[in-house]
Amino acid sequence: QVTVGVYDPCNLSHYPGWPLRNFLVLAAHKWGDALQSIEVLCFRDRTMQGVRDITHSIIFEVELPGRALGPDCPKAVGWEKNQKGGMGPRMVNLSECMDPKRLLAESSVDLNLKLMCWRLVPTLDLEKSVSAKCLLLGAGTLGCSVARTLMGWGVRKITFVDNAKISYSNPVRQPLYEFEDCLSGGKPKALAAADRLQKIFPGVSSEGFHMSIPMPGHPVNFSEVTMAQARKDVAKLEELIDTHDVVFLLMDTRESRWLPAVIAASKRKLVINAALGFDTFVVMRHGLKKPKQQESGYSCSSNPSSSSDLLGTSLFSNIPGYKLGCYFCNDVVAPGDSTRDRTLDQQCTVSRPGLAMVAGALAVELMVSVLQHPEGGYAVASSSDDRMNEPPTSLGLVPHQIRGFLSRFDNVLPVSLAFDKCTACSAKVLDQYEQEGFNFLAKVFNSSHSFLEDLTGLTLLHQETQAAEV
């Protein structure tokens, strides 16, 4: 007597599963002349309420027919051609339906966004926002608010950069931190924020880098160690900006935004900037420079009123994205050390508690609106005058700046042109950076503000202004 065992996926009490058919045909073809019958054990294994059970397995005897199938074994049933064209069993990936992280987290997050498309905005391209890789420079009040809103839009790649540690005053204003994060000197903000995002939503890929960003007016030439560290920090920042699609500037001081603004302008990355006052804020997108091969014939110093790109009658209407100004374009002085003569209480950002959440949310919504526009960062800027016109995207306007005044509960949408003497995005600064790299940056860090002013022509502008006044 011959007994064979077969793993049986069927749960019926009196019948085996269909895979047994293939084996019975093979047995009849190979041993039909020698055996009249075989005993078959259909082994069934299941776990119910933590207890393993095989008592529902069945055993029975099968009579084998004589050799009546011919010399060739018939084709097996239940197999289909796979992606490579070969015959094999059809496999179905049920991980999304069985994995609680995917089922309850990713599917639910995606469902909320898809409902927007199905019910309200059918032309919304979610992939553009979900696939955006976002770099957050600053993990404080603004950084926490921006990160949470990015997750709401389904963004899967978020990276933090910050050099501070969590203090006892932070958790009440910065929602990614808890009281325990302040103990033992405080955890690094960037690392703690990245870890908290993973706990909030396991599907997000978040990283944190505890590092400083070199700044104009903050010398780094005290020793070879400080110079080497500055070079290392610059190289890391360049690498991070290069590997991300959108850069958020969310730091405390003005000068800390200069270096990432220069690097991002050189690498043609979309920059979203947010800054706070006590009851005012500004959220803006930096002008996105044209690709280098298309820049011939264009310069920031060209007369905007005579440009063929400006189709409107107003000087500030229909300005394309590559002619928009950056955070420093309205300055007539170079950035410097803004904390040198300030007391400790003056060095802290003091603003109304709800302001950061408003500005952070608008920063993310501005990013999404820009990405939804067919021209992306090169989209023509919308102004306050366009509020009654047909919006350029399914989500509405795509402004250059949003300036808010909480005391009046009012927002305005100004537009400003790129400044040919800008200390961050002008052609002279970008050319020097691209040609000399860190050597140029070191001069900016270690020199007074006059270095950038002399380079860009601001010093001459000051002299001409004084001469005109006289």
Q: Where do the PLM segments sit?
A:
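Immunoglobulin-superfamily Ig-like beta-sandwich domains in protein ectodomains
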Residues: 112, 116, 166-168, 215-222
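Generic beta-strand/beta-sheet core signal
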Residues: 137, 153, 161-164, 209, ...
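Glycine-rich dinucleotide-binding loop and its adjacent helix/turn
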Residues: 105-128
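Glycine-rich adenosine-cofactor-binding loop
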Residues: 122-167
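Glycine-rich phosphate-binding loop and adjoining beta1-alpha1-beta2 segment
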Residues: 161-214
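Glycine-rich phosphate/adenylate-binding loop
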Residues: 1-107, 133, 216, 224-470
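Secondary-structure transition/capping motifs at alpha-helix termini
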Residues: 156-158, 200-204, 267-270, 322
